Amino acid sequence: MNQTASVSHHIKCQPSKTIKELGSNSPPQRNWKGIAIALLVILVVCSLITMSVILLTPDELTNSSETRLSLEELLGKGFGLHNPEARWINDTDVVYKTDNGHVMKLNAETNATTLLLDNSTFVTFKASRHSLSPDLKYVLLAYDVKQIFHYSFTASYLIYNIHTGEVWELNPPEVEDSVLQYAAWGVQGQQLIYIFENNIYYQPDIKSSSLRLTSSGKEGIVFNGIADWLYEEELLHSHIAHWWSPDGERLAFLMINDSLVPNMVIPRFTGALYPKAKQYPYPKAGQANPSVKLYVVNLYGPTHTLELMPPDIFKSREYYITMVKWVSNTRTVVRWLNRPQNISILTVCESTTGACSRKYEMTSDTWISKQNEEPVFSRDGSKFFMTVPVKQGGRGEFHHIAMFLVQSKSEQITVRHLTSGNWEVIRILAYDETTQKIYFLSTEFSPRGRQLYSASTEGLLSRDCISCNFRKEDCTYFDASFSPMNQHFLLFCEGPKVPMVSLHSTDNPSNYYILERNSMMKETIQKKKLAKREIRILHIDDYELPLQLSFPKDFLEKNQYALLLIIDEEPGGQMVTEKFHVDWDSVLIDTDNVIVARFDGRGSGFQGLKVLQEIHRRTGSVEAKDQIAAIKYLLKQPYIDSKRLSIFGKGYGGYIASMILKSDEKFFKCGTVVAPISDMKLYASAFSERYLGMPSKEESTYQASSVLHNIHGLKEENLLIIHGTADTKVHFQHSAELIKHLIKAGVNYTLQVYPDEGYHISDKSKHHFYSTILRFFSDCLKEEVSVLPQEPEEDE
């Protein structure tokens, strides 16, 4: 690799001490005018040399305080972002956790803080999670926490009296030292709910006896109030499958029945003489799915459980429930989705009678996105707001806010669109009935950022950006959370600089209090030579698609650099954003002078449905085509070394990377795939069927989308496969099938297995995991230095 040579800054230019006049016999005389001119010329030349040295000297010489980023530093405390877990407990008070572990209460009107729980409490009881009761008198402390799937975990729980220090265990009746699947406070006073052996238990307060609300729970078969794997990972994106009414008098919950769903077996190889196996229901594409029912149980007086029925169209079909929300003390709004995921019906159900009325139906020729979105209702239920796809000329459909007005007598609904444009409304946050304003996050300011906006729901529908002028050099990517009465809001700055959390008044957003600065991270970042980022827009098949390049800090366009292309983990995601990002690839950029590229091609999200849904029935081919087009563009840049290209992907990204590597286009010297999906038939039903349909009807589509089909294209590739054997999301079966086909085709590969590790590698193995990836790319991408043959010595 060409590098700028080191040059000393101390340059001395001295004139000769003796200047003789030539062609003169007379005694030496000094020509003072000539000497002065000569000295001036020498000084000018020295100045120019010094200036050019300063301009051409790399950053590491001009700023010696900056150091390169190491993996040890990346995984150390200095690079840990602190999440204060801030949440509203009423309209003026926020509860959060400081970076040193104290649990505090902050008053939004006075900025006064109160210590609720000392950090020593967590140490004393070895607790890693906590939850405060609504009356702030007690705290649930979780210890011996063991992760199950992405969101779910088991734990043992203590109830701790904040004022007296009194402690007692939370156990079901006649059970000691229990391990619970879930435990949390209700919405009023000291209400408690917990789940044990797939059944829901309820306590009106901490002194009361537990009441078992369900009895049908059965391990691995019937789940009450918590999600099975499919609902947790692909549908609810949470392990919580129950919802409190605002007054705490009712509880809605799902009963998920997996009795017909085939089980997946995950062996545990270490720690015992014979391997043990864990089984859990996992429906693959086209296989039997879980059935689901929605119930509401009355918690005051005699317990009474009522089933809320699906719309008639779904009674004889398979369906999912993807969203449940209380809109009053007795009414819930529910989203029902058919198995192909192209028909969605929104109903409002009266929990006292079980009667449900249809409010909105959506259909699609592909699939319906934003399945979990919660509508925002007015207090009297006469109007509600949610995002719907709206056509914006040739750019296709974008998600925008619609206001639905319900006629009280006829139940007819009129719709008014509040926003429009070639940008996306990400999420509706709140509706203020006093000001008639709706608050939301959108990409209007930048498709790669997120800003907080308000819009009037009456008159001219004027729209204001609330966050656009807040620390705009540091923050262009936001999230927000409003207090119950919308008088205040928390603003979460997530980039491009180090994230921070601030508290604002809705009436005067410029008046704010910084709740979390992440000062340690900020201080650490200032000492590091981190990458410079640049975003370019590529025009591919009438689409404008963003490419992000991360350059080494010492980047010079005259030099040539290796390139790493990183593929997104999920379809519908967004790689090119203004979020703060420091990860293992930052180490590679810094230590090996590699340029890292991220590209949002077709199939990516937040650029309209036309871009997103191009992959329908064409999964793997469209994404690969666009990523290859981005590589062809980069190869035209003089600073990219065409002989040193590499690719990385995890999960679905590993699948796309494999499809690219086996294609006819041979650009890459090496590639790494982590937990790669190799065949969509082997993956989750809700995921595969969303994009490809049912295997029984789309056999050729599934075959064309499989990495295992025509795998000879990988013969010339230098491939590293990494997989944990206990991966419950992308099973090791995917890598086993891939390896079997690679061996059959005579393809060389390198395999790194992590015994009993899941999709997310644990902290104890993380250093080895990242070291393996970095070492592989470092060896692959190092600059080849050709050695000139030595000439034979001549005989004397």
Swiss-Prot record:
Pfam families: DPPIV_N (PF00930), Peptidase_S9 (PF00326). N-glycosylation is important for cell surface expression, specially at Asn-257, which is crucial. It comes from the Eukaryota. Detected in brain cortex, hippocampus, thalamus and cerebellum Purkinje cells (at protein level). It is a single-pass type II membrane protein. InterPro entries: AB_hydrolase_fold (IPR029058), Peptidase_S9_cat (IPR001375), Peptidase_S9B_N (IPR002469), Serine_Prot_S9B/DPPIV (IPR050278). Gene3D superfamilies: alpha/beta hydrolase, Dipeptidylpeptidase IV, N-terminal domain. One of its GO terms (molecular function) is potassium channel regulator activity. GO terms for cellular component: membrane; plasma membrane; voltage-gated potassium channel complex. Promotes cell surface expression of the potassium channel KCND2. Modulates the activity and gating characteristics of the potassium channel KCND2. Has no dipeptidyl aminopeptidase activity. Belongs to the peptidase S9B family. DPPIV subfamily. This is Inactive dipeptidyl peptidase 10.
